[in-house]
Amino acid sequence: MNILSLRLKNFRNYKEAKISLSPNMNYIFGENAQGKTNLLEALYVLSLGRSFRTSHLTEAISFGSAYFFLEMTCEKDGFSHKLSIYVDKHGKKILSDQSPIKTLSQLIGMVPIVLFSSKDRLLISGSPSDRRLFLNLLLSQCDPQYKHTLSYYHRALLQRNSLLKTKQISTLSVWDEQLATLGAYLTLSRFTCCEQLNQLVQKLWNNSLSEHIRIKFKSSLIKQDKLSKESIIEELRKQLTSSLHRDLELGSTSVGPHREDFTLMINDLPVSQFSSEGQKHSLLAILRLAECLYIKNIHNVCPLFCMDDIHSGLDNHRISQLLDLAPTLGQTLMTSTHLPHQTLSKNSRIFLVNQAQVSIHSHSIIK
């Protein structure tokens, strides 16, 4: 799948704009606060129905406007498709070829996307919920059953927590059983995903042969000698029962997939404590590349790969590696404050953004 064009109306600092994209590299440069990141955000909102910059989409409406409208035209299997989203103070309306999309579950996965941005530092220094979100978004784009199971799990969790708060334990076992069955699928999916990402990350991380990079998945439900859905169901049943007294005191559920986490490790030491800032940034870029390859392996199609402000935190050597890999990653968008130093691949397109005006920039660095 390739995105042919992006249209924006009343989105951030864009009153109205339409951009035709290359199916390969799209390099977007310009000074700070001109609207480069807003273009990536628009694509992210269209793909996932949410922003990576705010939890309230209405905050992206241009000052003085009552709504924003975004539309992308895509090509898949030789056919053209349109995906649009309209947001105002009353809510949002999403259309796919003029047919309403009523839930985000329907939307997620239609246009797979991977974003590398400064907020990725939360995967190292943020809370467990930041890292669970990373896995949830990745798996939801690849596995329809995962996103539905995740939704049902959270509904069951809310019901159980409500009963715990009101000390109504007579029907608790019904929700315990649902959490155990649903939770086991989530945990096993996350564990398997981390193992596959580990293989991809290690192949991509060629900075030093002596460095071993891995994602250490942390779950009290995983027992290495009993790694199956059935064993995880049984373990979660036991933990829900044994933690009941504590859960009643807390008024919430203290065990389960909603407590899981992962740690990025280098040579079996936490990256958060034993790596330089440059090393951390490089590792996060590699993790996002691995995410692209993971989605490609599942869907047999490359996701849209967006990299924001690539010259912030990455050295020229790592940027060169990213640019060299870009042709194998499908459609890519990079933003920066200046032109690339490296030669871009054939059919790349360079855009200059100045005060929300986007123009094609011709430059000799394209082969």
Curated annotation (Swiss-Prot):
Keywords: ATP-binding, Cytoplasm, DNA damage, DNA repair, DNA replication, DNA-binding, Nucleotide-binding, SOS response. It comes from the Bacteria. The keyword Nucleotide-binding applies. ATP binds at G30, E31, N32, A33, Q34, G35, K36, T37. Signal peptide: none annotated. GO terms for molecular function: ATP binding; single-stranded DNA binding. One of its GO terms (cellular component) is cytoplasm. GO terms for biological process: DNA replication; DNA synthesis involved in DNA repair; double-strand break repair; SOS response. PROSITE patterns: RECF_1 (PS00617), RECF_2 (PS00618). InterPro entries: DNA-binding_RecF, DNA-binding_RecF_CS, P-loop_NTPase, RecF/RecN/SMC_N, RecF_2. It is found in: Cytoplasm. Belongs to the RecF family. PANTHER family: DNA REPLICATION AND REPAIR PROTEIN RECF. The RecF protein is involved in DNA metabolism; it is required for DNA replication and normal SOS inducibility. RecF binds preferentially to single-stranded, linear DNA. It also seems to bind ATP. This is DNA replication and repair protein RecF.
